[in-house]
């Protein structure tokens, strides 16, 4: 059955208007994004195939070319899907940053777990804070295995000094999923902590994240 053949109250747009967005299934939301199906199948079947494809793949790695491999998805539909995903990601990140609390390492993890927790390479970030411990910005410092040649104090503190940060929190992911700090993690953290003392920008913590968990190196007394 095609959308136009449905009872009006069951059509995705009308259902959203009557019952609210929380009443919508993933497939129904995708129907609104896609708008139309293809000659061989209606938008409801196409939407289910798209949702199944996204669930089977890491949505963070999706691109226009990848989505266009799905039968019935051209450039217009692919870009609409990615735009919807990106808006959701940005709003989620903004909410996590707004709810950040210095006393809660989990609030740092909430910012980064979805973004880098499942990445297959290490991403090293500095979270810059002002004198009231509010987030100024998050800065990507490096990608690749953490060591002292890649994570240089100059790169870590350059943005912090330029943006007037009072303190920083270091964050990086472990592609293996293990949260145990490596010797390189500990050495780099201790070095950056000392440099922070010298330049007057305190390193408050170093958080290691996976896709669904985190570890505070400060609480673990690794530095």
Curated annotation (Swiss-Prot):
<dbReference type="Pfam" id="PF04002">
    <property type="entry name" value="RadC"/>
</dbReference>
<feature type="domain" description="MPN">
    <location>
        <begin position="101"/>
        <end position="223"/>
    </location>
</feature>
<protein>
    <recommendedName>
        <fullName>UPF0758 protein FMG_0357</fullName>
    </recommendedName>
</protein>
<dbReference type="Pfam" id="PF20582">
    <property type="entry name" value="UPF0758_N"/>
</dbReference>
<keyword id="KW-0482">Metalloprotease</keyword>
<keyword id="KW-0645">Protease</keyword>
<keyword id="KW-0862">Zinc</keyword>
<feature type="binding site">
    <location>
        <position position="185"/>
    </location>
    <ligand>
        <name>Zn(2+)</name>
    </ligand>
</feature>
<feature type="binding site">
    <location>
        <position position="174"/>
    </location>
    <ligand>
        <name>Zn(2+)</name>
    </ligand>
</feature>
<dbReference type="InterPro" id="IPR025657">
    <property type="entry name" value="RadC_JAB"/>
</dbReference>
<dbReference type="InterPro" id="IPR020891">
    <property type="entry name" value="UPF0758_CS"/>
</dbReference>
<dbReference type="InterPro" id="IPR046778">
    <property type="entry name" value="UPF0758_N"/>
</dbReference>
<feature type="short sequence motif" description="JAMM motif">
    <location>
        <begin position="172"/>
        <end position="185"/>
    </location>
</feature>
<keyword id="KW-0378">Hydrolase</keyword>
<keyword id="KW-0479">Metal-binding</keyword>
<dbReference type="GO" id="GO:0006508">
    <property type="term" value="P:proteolysis"/>
</dbReference>
<dbReference type="InterPro" id="IPR037518">
    <property type="entry name" value="MPN"/>
</dbReference>
<dbReference type="GO" id="GO:0046872">
    <property type="term" value="F:metal ion binding"/>
</dbReference>
<dbReference type="InterPro" id="IPR001405">
    <property type="entry name" value="UPF0758"/>
</dbReference>
<dbReference type="GO" id="GO:0008237">
    <property type="term" value="F:metallopeptidase activity"/>
</dbReference>
<comment type="similarity">
    <text>Belongs to the UPF0758 family.</text>
</comment>
<feature type="binding site">
    <location>
        <position position="172"/>
    </location>
    <ligand>
        <name>Zn(2+)</name>
    </ligand>
</feature>
